[in-house]
Amino acid sequence: MKLILCTAIALTLAGCGGGGGGGGIPAVAPASAPAAASPVVADAATVVAVRPGVSPFIAFVDLRVAAGEVLSSAHYRIEPKPGSVSRPVDVDYAASYLSGRGYAASLGSSGSTVTVPVFGLYANYQNLVDIELQFADGDVEPIQAKVDTAAYTDPNGIYDRPVILKARTAGAALGFDFFYMKSALGSPVVVDTDGQMRWVVPATMSSASSAVRGNGFVIGDPQAPRVRRLEFDGTTRDTALQAPDVTNFHHNIDPGKVGLLGEVDAIRNGVQAIESTLVEFDPDTGALIKTWDLGDTLSRAMQAAGDDPAAFVRPGVDWFHMNAATYDPRDDSVIVSSRENFVLKIDYASGDLLWILGDPAKYWHTFPSLAARSLTLGSGGLYPIGQHAVSIAHDGSLMLMNDGLASVNQPAGAPAGEARGYSAVSAYTIDAAGRGATEATRFDYGQSVFSSVCSSAYEAAADGSVLVDYAVADNTTHARLVGLDPGQNVVFDFEYPTTGCNTSWNAQPISFDAMRFQ
């Protein structure tokens, strides 16, 4: 057994303003020569240098592994700031992952080099980073690095200056400690539940259509049929979507059966199909797995019951306005949100309509074929109106952000349905066989916040805590990010300035406190 030695090295990282310029995300070359640094003598490994990433929230710790040592994994933990109540950033890399990404060279030979990408750093702070190297013989070597980072000034003047309306306090139970905002102004922005920025990179492409997949971001291009893979080390890879009729992504990217679900615009028979097409795609290859034309789905259902769909399905018009979807493995189906109309469930394989849940005071309910497919909501429940962010909660209920906005694109003189002056998080239990639904839970913040469009609410997998994003609160001037414990008590409430939905059109928890790269 070797001696276990803890070494400390303090190095200052040059900063990067980040966030808004350049037309793309500059790639970091993992195998580049390390900057000059004073070597620290250690046993199985020595710290050679610490190099800055593309923003102050990212750094690269270069290590020299002694001859004969075979690395099995590298782990790091960033000590929280004093007074923080968020869990520390905690990341583990398998040696095979580091090698595959070019961060480990000639493992086991003399002078092997290993680079540990460290993300989630505090900006303008001396970060204490505890690194552990696990070797094949079972030995573990701790190395401690003090990493001074530069200040970060958000070029948008938004994300580095939240107003803390309610701070999370010590002991407040919450099933997540980090979340990311999907920004129309650049890359996703990761924030901890203290309100501290913990990750962003320079980018000009909107990250509104984004999701976490395989410990990295998948971002759909709002201007082209293209997918961008954005790693937490700041590197990127673009892949074309193999769908010749698709023109661009819009709204969200959601979990699918095999790949990811993307809301896209498309051209059909020479006419633009606006926000009514859903695809499942492989984010690594761009291959198309499945396509659902919701206009076709509803037309078939209407025609089968004797209705003429021409007055409802209107190509070239934003008649549907899809903004979210999710796969339901319990019956191999897909749940889709149409802001203008309703929530509907379709069969995964056939695309056939299974049921509709929506406000019967809207235009769609004037068609007998669609009314016959609708679920009746139990007494006292709120129908989904202008809803966003459909998902399956831990108890199997259908969760969504119930914005409260009536329809805006129905034909002249057609009923727009109910409108509310507040937004709510609603979760429904569905009785498909009995054609009924019950609003099982609701959080409406005392009916004090109205966020008419965009917005989201998602559970944390750990315990059912919920992150609520009021994207356009206060008459579209602020985004409000609110954390709820499992009892729907408000744990934190952060406010950011916004124009339209740009700041945080949608937001989700992210597990920076337990991330494993295999």
Report residues per predicted region.
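Histidine-/acidic-rich catalytic cores in large beta-rich domains
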Residues: 38-83, 88, 93-97, 107-115, ...
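Sec-dependent signal peptide recognition
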Residues: 1-7
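C-terminal motif of bacterial Sec signal peptides marking the signal peptidase cleavage site
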Residues: 12-15
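Bacterial signal peptide processing site
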Residues: 17-21
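Short, well-ordered beta-strand core segments
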Residues: 101-105
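Long, low-complexity intrinsically disordered segments that are proline/alanine-rich
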Residues: 22-38, 43
